[in-house]
Amino acid sequence: YNKGCAATAMTGIAATLLPFGKTLHSWGGIGLAKGDEEEILSKVRRNKKIREQWQTVELLIIDEVSMLTAELFEKLDYVARKVRKCDKFFGGLQLLLCGDFCQLPPVGSSEYCFQSELFMENIDCYLLDKIFRQQHDTQFQNILNDLRFGVLNTRNRELLKSRIVT
């Protein structure tokens, strides 16, 4: 564990899979993030431990980033700039955002974080396009690639059914 790095996720289940992981909401001290930017900032400033976390962390990892809304992304940027007293993007904090935007969407009908202008202007995206876990099973790789985009043809459906053990 390194105090300069915070490992967070958008859900509690995903956070348990990270070393010393917490939900982004818990780590950031933002609760449900209801209210405007100033209300959330006030909540963070009132908690010395949380405030110090924001001020000292150098790298913030956010897993399951596909569940992060554009609105929350922008609120967090505001909080980071104010608490860290730095007008750079996220107060100069480095972000490592992990996830697949074809998987879990933000809750409700909210916009994805990548739909924020702030995201588009400040985040470099890297597509990981090599499958390692199923590298010797090209048939299964093809099924996974199709399923990622919500496609399940008859041939693949039958193949998956044939692997059911009763």
Model-derived features: where do they sit?
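Conserved ATP-binding/catalytic motifs of P-loop helicase motor domains
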Residues: 1-166
